[in-house]
Amino acid sequence: MILFKQATYFISLFATVSCGCLTQLYENAFFRGGDVASMYTPNAQYCQMRCTFHPRCLLFSFLPASSINDMEKRFGCFLKDSVTGTLPKVHRTGAVSGHSLKQCGHQISACHRDIYKGVDMRGVNFNVSKVSSVEECQKRCTSNIRCQFFSYATQTFHKAEYRNNCLLKYSPGGTPTAIKVLSNVESGFSLKPCALSEIGCHMNIFQHLAFSDVDVARVLTPDAFVCRTICTYHPNCLFFTFYTNVWKIESQRNVCLLKTSESGTPSSSTPQENTISGYSLLTCKRTLPEPCHSKIYPGVDFGGEELNVTFVKGVNVCQETCTKMIRCQFFTYSLLPEDCKEEKCKCFLRLSMDGSPTRIAYGTQGSSGYSLRLCNTGDNSVCTTKTSTRIVGGTNSSWGEWPWQVSLQVKLTAQRHLCGGSLIGHQWVLTAAHCFDGLPLQDVWRIYSGILNLSDITKDTPFSQIKEIIIHQNYKVSEGNHDIALIKLQAPLNYTEFQKPICLPSKGDTSTIYTNCWVTGWGFSKEKGEIQNILQKVNIPLVTNEECQKRYQDYKITQRMVCAGYKEGGKDACKGDSGGPLVCKHNGMWRLVGITSWGEGCARREQPGVYTKVAEYMDWILEKTQSSDGKAQMQSPA
């Protein structure tokens, strides 16, 4: 009988990778050796997903029901590690093997929508109800805070009293404790990892408060935000308590306790200095954080098993080196004199059994962080390269199509959308300076990100507040020059599928010929119109500055501007789109080329829109967004 290690690990968010994305599945092949965990999964794809999120798994092998006579080994999923990144393959009829997708960017997802017919996924049955379809059963599971997977007996199930029964289930490891072939039964998983739960979530972090109840895991993390992300992707964590690095008990400092309860909420909480508590974000709708953490922690050392030590120039290069190395989970970059040669210093690449540091030390001459290979972008830049494919003549956008787009709203006696903007970093938004004409007070502004429909915004919708408005020093009201401003948010944003930064162009990027450009916003659909509810998009060609100058003979079109529009008109940005993005796709990457600034009317014939040219302001953007430790806080692929 095979021994399955249920719940002896939890999903790590900062896992190792091999170099390059390998998606090939090997039929009739089984990897020999290297086992780090085993479980039951309904197919090879789900087994691969579990491998992708496991801290040590690089390879997997799966045994379908048809591949083996031993009932206890059917649907067996074996997760494997290897120092070299590969293992010997042996022939096994029906077996399927493959690689982790940690290195595969946008293919990284914990969402699994498939329905499996003719199988019963076993676990702890905690809720039974009558429903009319398997889809309704899956929806109930998704809307139940404890449900991980389900089974549904169809109308043709052999026992009439069980027909249309929907069984909600969970297990210690989040996967079935057994899978049995059973006619007229359909099974599947909760869609909470798809950000489709209707439960709602608590995004607040509670300072100096400790939650009670059952601990399901304990890890070391540098801050409460890493703790929360780990909780979000742990199969049984519903809330957490984090003990800071100044907690009174030294052995408990930086401990992140992942917790659960029967009710789904803490049964009690206790005021405690230097503790921080919060909730899993798995039940958030459309706002799940990415399963990675990009922040670098200066003055901090991460301890763990040593993989390699190499000399590199700068902490960012150290993080990139960790990200590219086959098994690196986290790193420390040392600035000790004895660890440096000329301009390069030692980069310590490390790993652990659970993907988290085994020790965290403060007040050092090092900087530490995590591998970025579970970031969905799939490259060293956090800014996104993905979309699905004041807008006049535009069409409706879809969820996640333009994840950098934000709505700048003003709340005085009433609240209204005023301008657009572009997310360029965890704490930075780029927009037009003229949006703040007459409204320079930061307290009246609310920044909404990760939204599609303005009508979805209610008094309970989370928003960002402004910490600082930075308007270009040469901007003058009622003039079109230097129409650019930065917004620093009071708190950093988590990146999600619907909320990611746009890449910035290279400094002085004037030679690139862009042919696939889009403008987005909620602005008027005609000159004398009204704000649109659904985010609009329009594909629009760039116009040379020489041609643009001919159309605006009473104005000066400078090299710091870029124009776009159709000669015949009909499609353009308009009122309410100001500050929003003009983005262009080049070599597979979206870049913020312009900021919606001004124009003569909206979509008029031979009157192109004028945009602030972002490439001409890269020095200014870098200067203003540079942090105290010298790490740029916006996202640029250059």
From Swiss-Prot:
Top-level taxonomic group: Eukaryota
Tissue expression from the record: Found in plasma (at protein level).
Keyword NAD in record: no
This protein's UniProt keywords: Blood coagulation, Disease variant, Disulfide bond, Fibrinolysis, Glycoprotein, Hemostasis, Hydrolase, Inflammatory response, Protease, Repeat, Secreted, Serine protease, Signal, Zymogen
Main location: secreted
A single MF term (Gene Ontology): serine-type endopeptidase activity
Keyword Cell inner membrane: no
SMART domains per record: APPLE (SM00223), Tryp_SPc (SM00020)
Glycosylation, residue list: 127, 308, 396, 453, 494
Activity: how regulated: Inhibited by SERPINA5.
Subunit structure: Forms a heterodimer with SERPINA5. The zymogen is activated by factor XIIa, which cleaves the molecule into a light chain, which contains the active site, and a heavy chain, which associates with HMW kininogen. These chains are linked by one or more disulfide bonds. Interacts with iripin-3, a serine protease inhibitor from Ixodes ricinus saliva. Interacts with iripin-1, a serine protease inhibitor from Ixodes ricinus saliva.
Protein name: Plasma kallikrein
Gene field: KLKB1
